[in-house]
């Protein structure tokens, strides 16, 4: 088939008339220098603070320093293939991570990418890692308990849903153990848990994940891991990513618990980034806004009211409050709680659980110092039965510590002092607890009632824990109905108390311990 010249020219003309190009306006810049994961870029005139920047090879960065003629950005990932002269583009987006129930049971990095080898995560939603905390009007007071299963915490420093309770202590004092036990005890409590590991050894994180799997806790837990080998940028961002994942549940009228292990290493990572960006250093070489990085993170842990949840879900969820409870961990050096970061976080949180090296080495584990551990809002959330029976525990320990110091000098002690010392020794022994063995509310109530009513008085202190364990086993097999009632009502009525006392007497009469 031959085409005439006129037909060819008509065809070309029609093609030219219908030709269209879609132009995309994008700000571009050029890499000036790359050092230690920090990139200086020239030419990104419209970049926003905290905006994602795209490098060649599908690598992204975060704009942190906006200067007159250059931009300082931190690279999220490997920077070996980035070199001077590379073209950089603005994305117009803020960093987001995947959120939703699809992440539960998985181990992800600070960007929400799976690192457990179990395949991709098909999350339907993503959310910004930096969000404004709920305002005062949107909040509700803390009134529901978080049962940690640890006697010393639930009786002396109770934690409520929506609270921020700091766990602080030197290295190797059992901080992670307390937090992991609290996660294990949330089984069947309608609580989604997020464990954020910051700057830890990969082997340590793997060990925690294995323990959570062994106790069936990964069924309701998300692990966000930024190990010591990850770039400082990811260690800095991991807590915010974990918090966003927790807020997904909070905002939909559910309860979530998040553990930041630990925020000291996040502050170190931020200090490293800030110094490399040439920001002016302040106290202990931290930048001036190190308080703000922790306050804006921890203020996002809250209990939100029904109206907030209803508005957020467009009326799909009604009459439900949501909560995000935070257990931040801070590592001190030689017990110095007056250092910069510890004092910052103490002032932000609603109380602290202070773990001491001396107590830990003396075999008192969890090594909680009852004198300076406090819960500022958790008292209102404590379960009725523990509040009723555990009131004397803190007092007994405080009196014991005081009297024990004097007893070293006094040779002859009066009867009252001797009784107080004996009771203090007993309570100290009873507050000991094995790792990965959280107790139910009823088991705790049994121990506290037996201690209050003098059932331990004729038991040698060294045998107290064996007596307690045997008593729990006996009651579970013979008097399970009483324990079930305590667990379901979280209270102990007069008749139930008498029945429980009779059951303990039955145990003492018929069992060797």
UniProtKB/Swiss-Prot annotation:
EC assignment: 7.1.2.2
Organism per entry: Methylobacillus flagellatus (strain ATCC 51484 / DSM 6875 / VKM B-1610 / KT)
Molecular function in Gene Ontology: ADP binding; ATP binding; proton-transporting ATP synthase activity, rotational mechanism
Protein name, entry field: ATP synthase subunit alpha
Keywords: ATP synthesis, ATP-binding, Cell inner membrane, Cell membrane, CF(1), Hydrogen ion transport, Ion transport, Membrane, Nucleotide-binding, Translocase, Transport
Location in the cell: Cell inner membrane
Annotated family: Belongs to the ATPase alpha/beta chains family.
Gene: atpA
Site (Required for activity): 373
Broad enzyme group: translocase
Binding-site residues for ATP, renumbered to this chain: 169-176
């Amino acid at each position: 088939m031959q085409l005439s010249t006129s037909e060819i020219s008509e065809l070309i003309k029609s093609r030219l008339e219908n030709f269209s190009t879609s132009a995309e306006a994008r700000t571009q810049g050029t890499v000036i220098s790359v050092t230690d994961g920090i990139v200086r870029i020239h030419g990104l005139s419209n970049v926003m603070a905290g905006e994602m920047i795209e490098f060649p090879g599908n690598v992204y960065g975060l704009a942190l320093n906006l200067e007159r003629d250059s931009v300082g950005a931190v690279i999220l990932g490997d920077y070996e293939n980035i070199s001077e002269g590379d073209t950089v583009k603005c994305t117009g987006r803020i960093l987001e991570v995947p959120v939703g129930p699809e992440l539960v049971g998985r181990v992800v990095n600070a960007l929400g990418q799976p690192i457990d080898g179990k395949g991709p995560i098909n999350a339907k939603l993503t959310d910004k890692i930096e969000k404004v905390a709920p305002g005062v009007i949107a909040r509700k007071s803390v009134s529901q308990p978080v049962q940690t299963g640890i006697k010393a915490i639930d009786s002396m420093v109770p934690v409520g849903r929506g609270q921020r309770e700091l766990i602080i202590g030197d290295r190797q004092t059992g901080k992670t153990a307390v937090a992991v036990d609290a996660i294990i005890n949330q089984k069947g409590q309608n609580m989604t848990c997020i464990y954020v590991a910051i700057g830890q050894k990969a082997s340590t994180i793997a060990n925690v994940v294995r323990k959570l799997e062994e106790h069936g806790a990964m069924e309701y837990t998300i692990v966000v891991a930024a190990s010591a080998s990850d770039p400082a940028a990811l260690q800095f961002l991991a807590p915010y990513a974990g918090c966003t994942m927790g807020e997904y549940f909070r905002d939909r009228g559910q309860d979530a618990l998040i553990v930041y292990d630990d925020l000291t290493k996040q502050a170190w990572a931020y200090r490293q980034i800030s110094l490399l960006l040439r920001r002016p250093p302040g106290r202990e070489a931290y930048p001036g806004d190190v308080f703000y990085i922790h306050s804006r993170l921890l203020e996002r842990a809250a209990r939100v009211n029904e109206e907030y949840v209803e508005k957020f879900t467009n009326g799909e969820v009604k009459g439900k409050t949501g909560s995000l409870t935070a257990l931040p961990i801070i590592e001190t050096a030689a017990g110095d709680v007056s250092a910069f970061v510890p004092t910052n976080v103490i002032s932000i949180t609603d109380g602290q659980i202070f773990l001491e090296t001396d107590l830990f080495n003396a075999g008192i584990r969890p090594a909680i110092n009852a004198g300076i551990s406090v819960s500022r809002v958790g008292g209102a959330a404590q379960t009725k039965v523990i509040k009723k029976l555990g009131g004397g525990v803190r007092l007994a320990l405080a009196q014991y510590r005081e009297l024990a110091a004097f007893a070293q000098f006094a040779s002859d002690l009066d009867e009252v002092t001797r009784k107080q010392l004996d009771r203090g020794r007993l309570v100290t022994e009873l507050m000991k607890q094995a790792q990965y063995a959280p107790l139910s509310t009823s088991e705790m109530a049994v121990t506290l009632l037996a201690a209050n009513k003098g059932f331990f008085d004729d038991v040698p202190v060294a045998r107290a824990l064996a007596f307690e364990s045997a008593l729990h086993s006996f009651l579970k097999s013979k008097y399970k109905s009483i324990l079930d009632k305590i667990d379901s009502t979280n209270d102990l009525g007069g008749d139930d108390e008498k029945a429980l006392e009779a059951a303990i007497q039955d145990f003492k009469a018929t069992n060797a311990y």
